[in-house]
Regions:
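Acidic, mature catalytic/reactive cores of soluble proteins
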Residues: 1-224
Length: 224
């Protein structure tokens, strides 16, 4: 389902919404027809009304809620909003968008994964032109240890550590004020996403490009 407020449109990402429903497409198109105001933001809600727009859930759900029903333009609208929040976080600026948990260390990696799905559906050349700079900027940010909870080790793997004992993965259940499953170190899904992101980022660049070769070398190191 789609909810719209004055200048913000949100898509509900929950079991209630299924891509196979033919009614979703005309609903979304009808909504887009009258919300082309300047600076409109689009969000994906993790659940309504109990959850807000969460960064990790946004990037995981985005391809299925848009690309799989040929709503490529809506993918771009949601990603446009999310990219602002991502760049603000990477630059240490206040977040001006209503996307929560943008600080989770795997969020930038899931963003690249979502963009990779866009490349599969819309073509690598189009993806490189539209999102190539964002992908490379994210990879450079992570490699330079810009994220406070991620560190790239000499073995090419990402090491994750929470700053104050908070949850840094999707396994965030708490009992008696403590994490049920605290996870730190070489978290498997983080590094799977990292390896994938390196090779995908390299594939968006031309043969012989120095950055492409560097990303491939980092990926090869991580693979060992």
């Amino acid at each position: 389902r789609t909810w719209r407020t004055c200048s913000v449109e949100v898509i509900l990402a929950s079991p209630m919404v299924r891509i196979r429903s033919p009614s979703f497409r005309p609903q979304s198109r009808a909504g887009q027809g009258h919300i082309h105001e300047k600076n409109d933001d689009r969000y994906i809600l993790a659940g309504y009304p109990w959850f807000k727009s969460r960064a990790r859930d946004t990037f995981i759900a985005l391809p299925g809620l848009t690309l799989s029903i040929e709503e490529d333009e809506y993918f771009d609208l949601v990603m446009k909003t999310a990219e602002v929040a991502l760049r603000e976080f990477m630059e240490g600026k206040p977040i001006t968008k209503h996307i929560y948990e943008i600080e989770q260390p795997d969020v930038p990696l899931w963003a690249i994964w979502a963009i990779q799905q866009y490349a599969k559906e819309c073509g690598r050349e189009k993806c490189a032109k539209k999102y190539g700079a964002l992908v490379i900027d994210i990879l450079k940010y992570i490699e330079s240890d810009g994220h406070p909870n991620l560190k790239l080790h000499d073995n090419g793997l990402l090491y994750a550590q929470s700053s104050h004992g908070e949850a840094i993965t999707w396994m965030n259940s708490v009992a008696n004020g403590r994490l049920v499953v605290p996870r730190t170190g070489y978290i498997v899904e983080f590094n799977a996403l990292w390896y994938n992101a390196l090779l995908f980022g390299a594939s968006l660049l031309d043969e012989g490009n120095a950055v492409r070769e560097h990303l491939q070398a980092v990926a090869a190191n991580a693979k060992q």
